[in-house]
């Protein structure tokens, strides 16, 4: 009779241990699941060049006038001091990559040629920092060029 009580106690403890381990494993597996994915941000790099800035460039401008208008170039060709590159790259977290490049060629101290690559006609849209997912295309706050400090 003592052996039967001892066996039933062992079985009860074993069942309790099995339930505890099963519950722990299940909770661990479920905790890795969530509705929201990994948080991603839009990553903008380089010189932001707008169409308004590019349109103000005129052949014959001096290097200093170009720097005053555009800022310092992202790249100066190491073997050709006559070429400046203004590169802008927007790696959208929930989309593709948008890249623009403006290559300026000088003759001496004067701007001689302007070469555009990419779509300068519209400003790049960067995701709203307060959101969790992709930018809603109707959300004007996601556009840095239209953002105002009083937007809340």
UniProtKB/Swiss-Prot annotation:
Keywords of this entry: Cell outer membrane, Lipoprotein, Membrane, Palmitate, Signal
Single GO MF annotation: protein-macromolecule adaptor activity
Record region (Disordered): 114-152
Membrane topology: Lipid-anchor
Residues where lipid is bound covalently (N-palmitoyl cysteine): 33
Keyword Aminoacyl-tRNA synthetase set for record: no
Record's GO cellular component terms: Bam protein complex
Localisation per UniProt entry: Cell outer membrane
Signal sequence extent: 1-32
S-diacylglycerol cysteine lipid sites: 33
Any GO BP: Gram-negative-bacterium-type cell outer membrane assembly
Pfam families for this protein: BamE
Record-linked InterPro entries: BamE, BamE-like, BamE_dom
Main subcellular localisation: membrane
Assembly information from the UniProt record: Part of the Bam complex.
Function according to Swiss-Prot or TrEMBL: Part of the outer membrane protein assembly complex, which is involved in assembly and insertion of beta-barrel proteins into the outer membrane.
Entry's family note: Belongs to the BamE family.
Protein name (database record): Outer membrane protein assembly factor BamE
